[in-house]
Amino acid sequence: MAVCIAVIAKENYPLYIRSVPTENELKFHYTVHTSLDVVDEKISAMGKALVDQRELYLGLLYPTEDYKVYGYVTNSKVKFVMVVDSSNTALRDNEIRSMFRKLHNSYTDIMCNPFYNPGDRIHSRAFDTMVNSMMMQVC
Amino acid sequence: MADEALFLLLHSEMVAGLYRAAEQGEGENGRCTTKLESMGFRVGQGLIERFTKDTARFKDELDIMKFICKDFWTTVFKKQIDNLRTNHQGIYVLQDNKFRLLTQMSAGKQYLEHAPKYLAFTCGLIRGGLSNLGIKSIVTAEVSSMPACKFQVMIQKI
C-alpha cells in the first residue's frame, strides 16, 4: 500500500501527484522531487551494470527513516515514483513491480485517450480509481 | 484477414474526406497535408506508448530506429521495412518496397502525383513515435515508383 504516487513527465514536471495523509503533502512533493536525481543517476549508469540496463523497473531508489522510495521509468522517459511506508514490511518486490505494471497500463490507456494532450496534467477518473486502490486506507 | 483492409480503407477515406472538405471550404491545399501529418503524430505517440510497454529499455538512437523498422512497422503494416540506411550523423532512410497503403493504387508510375497525400499520415506516425521516445525529428517521404517508397528521418539535435 503506497503512501504517495507520482507520475513525472520526461521534462521532469509532475503530471500527477497524489498522497494519502493530505496534511503532509508538501513533504511528499519534496521527496518525489529529490528522488528524480536518483532516477537520473540510475538511468545514466551505463556500463556500470548497477542496474539491469534493459529493465524498466528501477527498484528501491533510497530509504529514509519513515519511507522507502521506488522508481520506474518507461521507454518514453515518463517516470513513476512511489513512496511506501517503511513500517509496512509485508510489501515484497514482486508486489511493487505489479503495482508499477498497473500504473504503466493505466498511463498507456490515458495516452490513447483522444481527449488527452500529451504533456497535460492527468485528470482521468479511471486513473484516480486505480491509484486509490493502491493507496493506503487511512480512516 | 479483414482487419488489414480496415485500416487501409479508413485511411483512404480520411485522405479523400479531408481534401473534399478543403475544396468546399476556403483553405489552401497545403493545409491538408499538415492536418494529416499532425493526426499521424498524435496517433504515433499513443501507439508507441502501447508498443514499448513491455519491451526493454533502448540503448541508443540506432536501437530505436531498428525498433521502428521491425516491431513497429510489423504491428502497423504487417511487414518490416526492407532497407534501413544511415549516415550515422542523424539521417536515416527507411525504404519499403511494397508500402501497404500504396499497393492498391498502382504498380508503376500511374497516380504518382497523388502518392504524397497518402504518405503524410505515415510520416506523422513515425515523427510522433520518435518524439514520444525522446527524439525530435523531421520526416519526409518520397515515391519514385509505386508501391515502393522511402521515408527520410532527420534527427534534430538541440
From Swiss-Prot, chain A:
Compartmental location: Cytoplasm, Perinuclear region; Endoplasmic reticulum; Golgi apparatus
Gene3D superfamilies, alphabetized: 3.30.450.70
A Pfam family: Sedlin_N
Any one of the GO CC terms: perinuclear region of cytoplasm
Keyword Transport attached: yes
PANTHER family: TRAFFICKING PROTEIN PARTICLE COMPLEX SUBUNIT 2
Biological role: May play a role in vesicular transport from endoplasmic reticulum to Golgi.
Organism expressing this protein natively: Taeniopygia guttata
BP GO terms, sorted: endoplasmic reticulum to Golgi vesicle-mediated transport
The protein's name in its UniProt record: Trafficking protein particle complex subunit 2-like protein
Family indicated by similarity: Belongs to the TRAPP small subunits family. Sedlin subfamily.
Alphabetical UniProt keywords: Cytoplasm, Endoplasmic reticulum, ER-Golgi transport, Golgi apparatus, Transport
InterPro entries cross-referenced by the UniProt entry: Longin-like_dom_sf (IPR011012), Sedlin (IPR006722), TRAPPC2L (IPR044760)
